[in-house]
């Protein structure tokens, strides 16, 4: 029985795998323990992960629950490490496989020199001797180790010996020509190999002796492996034969693959799994899905279609994801009448079902692009391409959910069978019924299924191991010998719930009136009445007292816990609490000290760092991921709670919603009922508040985090889609026609790239229509300015002359310039001027446009390994230019080029948070977009085989993938690197029918180029999007459009129609579609119209045309390298110049010069020029714009920001007072802080302010709607206080006192030092309050320190220590006397108390509840009334003794104080703790003096039930990190 069939799996992390999932190599099976011809049954558990969670939960629950028991050790468990797949593979390799490996390992020459010929199995001895001789020769060249490896690999074809010493005696005859013939006698499973598969495999892998047995073992392989034999036939010397059988040597032989790193095998697609994917006739992406595509019947497809409609297109998210989900919404359901919604919805469900039918029905196996292009009628314009991918992705989720449901169903069914048929009485307590199994089938989400499994694990988890043992024994009784290896883990012995079950506490829980399931069913309506017990709760509990539960309070607490636990695991209860929590949860945020220093104006959370009472439903897009990341980095503290501040103030907690409905309360008012109602309320309170709320907090947190991550992935996908959505530059047809014969009809693109390092040379490159490099240009001084000083202008002109000659010689159709920084705009103008000069001189036929282009992709390519491998001699900037030119030609091949084994595509910057999300999900979404665009454009398969930079496009073709594309290219290279027609994909490349159907329509054959290379017939339709399945319809349309006889040549008709496509307009395609429908082809109207469109223009580019970045897009590209500029942020800028407003000549007459007290006249415009008479000022104004004339009125300053952008600061934003001349406030070439007031990206305009009021002011209008102003003000006040305190500390006089205990530190620093010092140490430091005083600090226990003031007097100097030190009315001469007489006595008494065995170390005496719990624990542990010491936090040097003073279990708390003279207790003095305790033990029953005022006690036992707690207010919110 298969391992998976024997065990239902729940955990994703389960190690169990089915043999059906992946073929095992033969060597893998040989490496395992040999199997006898006996059936082996392996029981495993998928509950390991869940059990570990329960185990951890159990440990937490057991802390402080009941009396201690002896700890029981768990059995040591060890897991066998997985064997390396690399060492298990024994594949046949053809020459190209070996070449690929050697290329990766950089040993091409070595392999060629040491090539070994592998001998074939034969009856003749010559191949055997040759193979052995080759091995010996190889060993002599490489050494014995390599020789052994090569013989191990070739042993299948030769004699199979490892060395000469291993040969049998039968091998002594070598040269008589009658060598023994060896036959293997073994079980074979060839019936499982499809007919013709071996032939296909030989063609694909390029080897003649391909053997499936070397890749995959059949089902009987393991059973027959032990008995594998060799049969040796020899001549008996008398004309007869002797057959000798012997066990075949199964010693593991080292192969070539075993010497290769696994990563290299993966990169080369050389593993057994890769080979299987290549051979199997199914789309590669179907096989690579985490949950592979499986077969489904019609009923299953209907259920799945309804499920996808509900959860993919109708289900709402917890947070607001409307913006990122817009692309996936169903456009057909938008803006329609409510009366039509239901019909439209049903139509969409049918369309989804049709799509699933194409995907999951094995006879179809169609990928999304094929469905979108060639099955349009089935989706009837109801689903877009994005919708189709959503259906595909949700199909994977549905299959995953179905598999988990199946496994849990099987597990529960087996448990039910165990309950019914076994003799285990404990298993029958809670029988599994049919409804429990039905609930699994009705589960629609992973959350619901997890709830069911959690409940199952609680109730039956402890029985799993017993169940598997029973199943083993049952199989053994049926005659099946089993090998048993249990992987179930029973519930741990110290699990709190399980201990209650084992001690029979569940019977008391059953007397509470309702079971957990009945309680859950009562949530909607009162389906079950409460069965009231006649006994009082504590009286009922007395019946179940046992050694583990020693009193009735403990018994009752255990029963309450059991029922609460069961309630918390009920799926209906969880579902209700989950929905309440998701609908009403709020969160609070505040920055930590690190966050306040780190989060500045440019941080995404700057205006969201103080949040109060924000509902999680108000979170948008990826907002929560920013919070999560900031929390991980220690920048913020965050709280997630159900109740808002208003709810807490009104006492409206989550549990109260469940208690207010009186679901678990009896409507009677007797004392018995009231006590039981109180117990029931406590149960519900425990289930909701203590168990479900923490669980739901974590679940909701993870849910909204996943939604935020998915938002990032979708935004990355959208950004990526926008980058590949446009085509390359296509020159106008006139430009192509007017060229000479040498350059005609060929697109040529040029790109120039410069480095941000100005000393480096710039490079230009020309590529042809295939992206191949034609020529390149090196310009050393391209980035210099033409009007610079010295010889800069001449050097610039030298580079520009080289550019002109290059353009004149190569005649590019367009020129691209990389956007590196702000300099690109100037360099573009230089290029445009040079091109215009060439055109004006008639050196080129037409104007050549210069385009600025984003160079991010080009820079990624420049740094990639694949770029270095393709262009090893080119400098980095030239490699960047090559990529930029190819992008200008067509961006898609260049993006696909980076989708390689190095994953260079993920170096693109698509979103600031893209590194913080699951890269597998990101890769899946980006892959969808590339698949869409590649198939929309079509793939020229011959170009992929000829040019390496086009090769990667093939893997995105519908039906293919990286492995199948690699195999296909290998076949093409074996066919002279040319595919003349699509049909050759089947005939020559051996594509299976399903893969061919998927990819055929998207593979383009450039019929013009192919016709030039071959004399074979070339099908013109192979160069179109018309699918081969509809070629006959296309020919029929061509013949009908030309109105010729049906016997006419359809190929000629097609050629004529393509030259005159307007003749197709007269065709009645609707009638043609109706005729096809009548003939049984189905609805094909959309297909016919697509064929007509394709005949009019083959493979018309459906992408948007190329455009140069401009406006906001160009602004973002130019500013991406520097600090992000946002409105409200503060930036450093340098004043470059003063901006003047020109003098309007019409206004000169109205301008009146200002007259000063010095009898001078000032120009009213510039406010700078002065003259002795008004006429001179007028002449100054009239000469405006000329040398010496008026420059105009100053209106502001030009500022250069850190990111290279130029901004403007008007006069009104320079200062709060009026400014005529900005230079009176600022200086040129000096840096100042500015605040960004406004940004206009279209005009490249940034408005600044340097007014002090603007720099100090935040931007409250931009803050979050739930901004916590109070917390913000408190933090600002605290920061100011801390700053003031630090200033005061810095100004405090440093004392110079020569004593080992003296330190110039603060109180906080002193406490930290004491934590690292011995218990007997103390620290003397300067007093923070008085100059003539000291402070002494010493440690009592953790977090409690005693600090007191020492007055100094009779000081000689201000800095010296006083000759008299006074504390509490006592005088001391020096510090040593102070420490010896005053400090050390208190430290010693304190140490005696804090190291006592009954000292409470978990808290302080103020923590009364914790102290009392500790007293009870000590009583159970010791069996008598104990006493406990605790220290006071609020009053250092004061301690408390807590003890039970009578049989009523009441606890009394008495305080005592220590001093240098001893201990003061009950108004008496004791010189040691021992003397105090001796007196206390004799008088503890006596009431202490002043009991009413100075003593406190609290009852802990009563005759009635524990105090009623229908709900508990949670503790005040505490920020956690």
Swiss-Prot record:
Keywords: Nucleus, Transcription. CDD domains: SH2_Cterm_SPT6_like, SH2_Nterm_SPT6_like. Residues 1182-1251 form the S1 motif domain. SMART domains: SH2 (SM00252), YqgFc (SM00732). GO terms for cellular component: transcription elongation factor complex. A motif (Nuclear localization signal) lies at residues 26-42. InterPro entries: HHH_9, NA-bd_OB-fold, RNaseH-like_sf, RuvA_2-like, S1_domain, SH2, SH2_dom_sf, Spt6_acidic_N_dom. It is found in: Nucleus. Residues 45-56, 67-76, 90-103, 167-177 have a biased composition (Acidic residues). Residues 77-89, 127-149 have a biased composition (Basic and acidic residues). GO terms for biological process: nucleosome organization; transcription elongation by RNA polymerase II; transcription elongation-coupled chromatin remodeling. Residues 1299-1388 form the SH2 domain. Disulfide bonds: none annotated. Its main location: nucleus. Residues 26-41 have a biased composition (Basic residues). Histone H3-H4 chaperone that plays a role in maintenance of chromatin structure during RNA polymerase II transcription elongation. May be required for several aspects of morphogenesis of C.briggsae, including regulation of division in the germline and gut and specification of ventral-uterine precursor cell fate. Belongs to the SPT6 family. Interacts with glp-1 and lin-12. This is Suppressor of Ty 6 homolog. It comes from Caenorhabditis briggsae.
